[in-house]
């Protein structure tokens, strides 16, 4: 059985990296875990002995047959043949109470759908996941992983950074070279761990914050003030920027998350143009 390009399949074969992914999940015997895209079960085989229940979601019908043949007799394993992005797993689990409400996620996901999967797992700034996971360990493209953990004033810092860091703490576990996969991808990969959590001081108007971030990074070469002029008069923006110690020449990537939240809270008192 060969990986299918249309599903973005690259199977992880490096045993050390597989062990690092499982270690990063910090599994307990009572854990219920969600695995997205199990492939041929390289991670599955390591997860099953350590958890109470493992729900694996796989879109590839042939791989589902393979997984059922090799793991279908395990009492703590349940396979759902479905597109994770289009499926409400809770609807499927009504007759399987042992697998309901998984609290941890471990997955080697197709790189071309990383953004949508992150959004489904975490929610959005204005609509966060109402039942957040305890931890999410993902193997993703390094370029995207760098953006998740980026700091202000760096090239990787951007809208995705803010959207994810508003909802979760993010850290890099390890870098994964192309040779760790079959077939080899053309890019480096990285294992990241996300721990969803509420902010101590969330935005007063999360929808406005999401809008500001979108507009603020609409043209990264422009100064933030100039991007936001499409929403607010400079007479409103300038004194607020000064109060928040944001330079009039600052670009979006030079403003940290707390400053973005403070900016949103201040602008919440004014109608958009």
Swiss-Prot record:
It is an enzyme of class 2 (transferase). The keyword Transmembrane helix does not apply. It is found in: Cytoplasm. GO terms for cellular component: cytosol. Transmembrane segments: none annotated. NCBIfam families: ksgA (TIGR00755). S-adenosyl-L-methionine binds at residues 10, 12, 37, 58, 83, 108. Specifically dimethylates two adjacent adenosines (A1518 and A1519) in the loop of a conserved hairpin near the 3'-end of 16S rRNA in the 30S particle. May play a critical role in biogenesis of 30S subunits. This is Ribosomal RNA small subunit methyltransferase A. It holds the Pfam family RrnaAD. Gene3D superfamilies: Ribosomal RNA adenine dimethylase-like, domain 2, Vaccinia Virus protein VP39. Belongs to the class I-like SAM-binding methyltransferase superfamily. rRNA adenine N(6)-methyltransferase family. RsmA subfamily. One of its GO terms (molecular function) is 16S rRNA (adenine(1518)-N(6)/adenine(1519)-N(6))-dimethyltransferase activity. Keywords: Cytoplasm, Methyltransferase, RNA-binding, rRNA processing, S-adenosyl-L-methionine, Transferase. InterPro entries: KsgA/Erm, rRNA_Ade_diMease-like_C, rRNA_Ade_Mease_Trfase_CS, rRNA_Ade_methylase_Trfase_N, rRNA_adenine_dimethylase, SAM-dependent_MTases_sf. Its EC number is 2.1.1.182. It catalyses: adenosine(1518)/adenosine(1519) in 16S rRNA + 4 S-adenosyl-L-methionine = N(6)-dimethyladenosine(1518)/N(6)-dimethyladenosine(1519) in 16S rRNA + 4 S-adenosyl-L-homocysteine + 4 H(+). It comes from Picosynechococcus sp. (strain ATCC 27264 / PCC 7002 / PR-6).
């Amino acid at each position: 059985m060969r990986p299918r390009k249309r599903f973005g399949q690259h199977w992880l074969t490096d045993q050390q990296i597989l062990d690092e992914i499982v270690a990063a999940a910090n599994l307990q015997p009572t854990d219920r875990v969600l695995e997205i895209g199990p492939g041929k079960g390289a991670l599955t085989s390591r997860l099953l002995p350590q958890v109470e229940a493992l729900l694996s979601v796989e879109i590839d019908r042939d791989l589902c047959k393979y997984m059922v043949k090799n793991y279908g007799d395990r009492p703590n394993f349940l396979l759902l043949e479905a597109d994770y992005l289009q499926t409400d797993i809770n609807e499927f689990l009504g007759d399987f109470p042992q697998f309901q409400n998984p609290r941890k996620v471990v997955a080697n996901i197709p790189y071309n759908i990383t953004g949508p999967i992150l959004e489904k797992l975490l929610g959005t700034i204005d609509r966060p996941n109402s039942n957040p996971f305890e931890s999410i360990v993902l193997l993703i493209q390094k370029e995207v992983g760098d953006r998740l953990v980026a700091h202000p004033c760096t090239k990787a810092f951007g809208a995705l950074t803010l959207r994810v860091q508003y909802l979760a703490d993010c850290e890099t576990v390890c870098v994964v070279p192309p040779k760790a996969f079959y077939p080899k991808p053309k890019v480096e990969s990285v294992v990241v761990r996300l721990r969803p959590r509420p902010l101590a001081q969330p935005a007063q108007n999360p929808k406005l914050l999401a809008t500001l971030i979108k507009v603020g990074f609409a043209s990264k070469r422009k100064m933030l003030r100039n991007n936001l002029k499409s929403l607010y008069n400079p007479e409103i923006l300038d004194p607020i920027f000064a109060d928040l110690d944001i330079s009039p020449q600052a670009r979006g990537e030079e403003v940290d998350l707390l400053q973005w939240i403070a900016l949103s809270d201040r602008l919440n008192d004014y109608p958009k143009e």
